[in-house]
Amino acid sequence: MSLLRIRKASLYGFSTVFILLQSYAVAYPLRAFRQNDGIGIAMNPSQDGGFVSAEKDSDFEYWMKLIISAVLILLGGVFAGLTIGLMGCDDLHLQVLEQSGDASERVHARKVLKLLRRGKHWVLVTLLLGNVIVNETLPIVFDSIIGGGWPAVLISTAMIVIFGEVIPQATCVRYGLSIGAKLEPIVLFMMYLLWPIAYPTALILDACLGESQSTMYKKSGLKTLVTLHRDLGIDKLNQDEVTIITAVLDLREKHAESIMTPIEDVFTLPMDRILDEDLIGEIICAGYSRIPVHKPGFPHDFIGMLLTKTLIGYDPDDKWPVGKFALATLPQTWPNTSCLDLLNYCQEGKSHMILISNSPGEPHGAIGVITLEDIIEELIGEEIIDETDVYIDVHKGLPRVGENNDFWNRMLHRSHLSTMAALHKSQRSHDLAANEHAPILNPKNSALNPRLVTNDRVKVKSPSLIQSSTGYGSMSQSPSRSDLPSKISRVNAELQAHGSQRSSIDVSKENKSSVADGPSSQAHNGPSTQPPEALPNGTDPSSSKTTENNGNQQSERTESADGKKDNSGSISSNSSKTFTGKRVRLGNVIESNVVSPDGTNRIVIEPFERSVDPNNADIVEMVERNGIVVPKVTVTSHEDDVDSVHNTPMSVSSTLSVKTSSSKVPRNKRKRRKGKSKK
């Protein structure tokens, strides 16, 4: 539709210019020409001996000059319109249209990009030179048609301004991409036609001004652009999309200290606290899935966290201390660590709660905790409320109100709403002030201890009833207890059969490869007779073989995780599945293991710029190899590297072993190639 309008406008413009020039030229120039010369109609001799009227020659010349004037006006309009149309096209916008536009926009953007990449200044100088040449030639042609005087000046100026500047530029501002793509051959022809002048001038402009840069937005500009798309444009964004996009752009600049829960508001436990009925009730009523645990008498010296799901099978009558349970690792980090880096760390599955401390790795300095839910709330820009949340915002002390109470959901910010009063029964109407209203539903945790709070849906048996009944509560009385040894032996038999089957497959593979390589390479397939110093990291052959088998098992687990069949042709069991698609931002944070003098291990997460001693074995930069995130190490055969391997933490040393086995395979291949060449 736009191209049809452009063609119609061009046709109307050409017709209008031609008619105006003709009407004025008919009225003035021939009459003025004849009066000024004072000559009548002259007769020119012809070839056949006759005479031809000079009026016919003047009419032909007049019409030719009239057509040339109209063409020059249109060419001037084309050059002026393309100048503002092509120079107004941004490279970044063209790349966006080339990749995400519709079919016509992709074709037009590709043509214009190809033209502008030859040199934007070259295109600019060519169009300006063409416009100048046309505008300087047009008065010369007008003078011979219209003659001098103010009528000629007025008409030529009006023609150039209206049909050579205003209309073309106004059209190309709106349809510059499509017009530039259609006229790309003409511009390319003019570029090479005016190359002796245009190209050197463009080189001078490039040297003085530099190459033109695309329009790049800062994060603040992007947020403003996204906000404008909420109210403008064809594909408008709703408020939720705008909130999430702007929150994602701010996530990297947000520090952990700004969104953490202060340590004073965190539900913590000392490691010597006895887990009895009362403490179990407190944990259930609190509604937290992870509870930080600190040393007795040192509320800021945290050693781990207690996962409440480990208490499912715990009997409160045992009265174990908290420190007797298997505590999960509670990593520590600095207050200014980026929330985006912490999100990537939590994605590795190591911990969903991180301790914020002014001195990570030390038994003091804890100022708060941050969870994966806190980071995701900042990521989406809204609070997440699950079934067991008591507070909407711990920082502001806003309690949770029932989802059907829309009025109190809007009134939670009022100062007269007491946090603790909302946890109890509603006040009576005569106890309320004039500006207060009783909530319809109370913020109440549904997961209460049935031994303390009566619940019709939960039946609690007394201890005497439990002892009198058979097959309940006690492992010795449970019928599944007798089947436990048989289950263990059956599982061990399956594992042993699976291992022997895998080893037989490996042996058959080696035999096939040895037969294919010939006798010269069979010597390298047998047991390794190299000294320990010849192997990577100075490990002995037996350990190297073990790590190689572990590497093969790991590769087989990866295949089974992808849903592929192993070498035996059967699908591997679910127990062999492993997750290898870990997604991290490499080099942003470093995980180090700090051991205090009392033997407590603490995991410290710090930004990459804070590593003052990169040669320390406890601080390893994580890199990605074959889709698995492993520490960045250099495998050498020096003896002093052996000590560094043994001093490395367990996770790092195991990764080093796998790396050693993987680096051993190419060496054997090189030996086989040498054997073939000798043969």
Curated annotation (Swiss-Prot):
Residues 260-321, 322-387 form the CBS domain. One of its GO terms (biological process) is magnesium ion transmembrane transport. Its main location: membrane. PROSITE patterns: CNNM (PS51846). Residues 666-679 have a biased composition (Basic residues). Residues 58-241 form the CNNM transmembrane domain. It comes from the Eukaryota. It is a multi-pass membrane protein. Residues 464-483, 519-528, 539-555 have a biased composition (Polar residues). Residues 651-665 have a biased composition (Low complexity). Pfam families: CNNM. Residues 28-65, 143, 206-679 are extracellular. The modification Phosphoserine is found at residues 476, 478, 596. Residues 1-27 form the signal peptide. Coiled coil: none annotated. Residues 556-567 have a biased composition (Basic and acidic residues). One of its GO terms (molecular function) is magnesium ion transmembrane transporter activity. InterPro entries: ACDP, CBS_dom_sf, CNNM, Ion_transp-like_CBS. This is Uncharacterized protein C4B3.03c. It comes from Schizosaccharomyces pombe (strain 972 / ATCC 24843) (Fission yeast).
